[in-house]
Amino acid sequence: MALVEGNNGVSGGAVSFSEEQEALVLKSWAIMKKDSANIGLRFFLKIFEVAPSASQMFSFLRNSDVPLEKNPKLKTHAMSVFVMLRKAGKVTVRDTTLKRLGATHFKYGVGDAHFEVTRFALLETIKEAVPVDMWSPAMKSAWSEAYNQLVAAIKQEMKPAE
């Protein structure tokens, strides 16, 4: 299954992960999508718990007196980020989205350490969101691989906006 689609994708073509990995991501997503807004918010709260200074990378959080968990702009942003891999029932991200993500992450100085914190927060959030008997090393690996591929694609596009 292609994770990145479009004319150029990653390294000149689509990057894929196994059907088993895709099935695990889709199975867990089917459980989480009913509460994706709250799960997305918990994901960002986990990021800020691990790396409090990360909140300053978001213009809508700087100088805000609204508690993070009640910030409507964070809730909206969290929802959009959390469902990104699940557009149109596929585990894909379009080239145009990657270009925008790359430019945005470049603009705000996102680096490897930020991506690592985000990976940790994502995996912990999913682990807490799915039933205990569903979470497994294979599911963790599947989500980690999907995330790794997304990050690799974003990094290829990390340059100033044109």
Swiss-Prot record:
Q: Which family does it belong to?
A: Belongs to the plant globin family.
What InterPro entries does the database record attribute to this sequence?
Answer: Globin (IPR000971), Globin-like_sf (IPR009050), Globin/Proto (IPR012292), Leghaemoglobin-like (IPR001032), Leghaemoglobin_Fe_BS (IPR019824)
UniProt keyword list: Cytoplasm, Heme, Iron, Metal-binding, Nucleus, Oxidoreductase, Oxygen transport, Stress response, Transport
Q: Which GO terms describe its cellular component?
A: cytoplasm; nucleus
A GO BP term, please?
response to salt
Q: What class of enzyme is it?
A: oxidoreductase
Please classify the protein's predominant subcellular localization into one broad category: cytoplasm
Identify the residue span(s) of motif Homodimerization: 49-53, 112-124
**What protein does this entry describe?**
Anaerobic nitrite reductase NSHB2
Which compartment or compartments is the protein found in?
Cytoplasm; Nucleus
In which tissues does this protein get expressed?
A: Mainly expressed in germinating seeds, seedlings, roots, flowers and leaves.
Q: What induces it?
A: Accumulates upon salt (NaCL), drought, cold and asbcisic acid (ABA) treatment and in response to osmotic stress (mannitol). Induced in nutrient deficient conditions (e.g. K(+) and Ca(2+) deprivation), but down-regulated in resupply conditions.
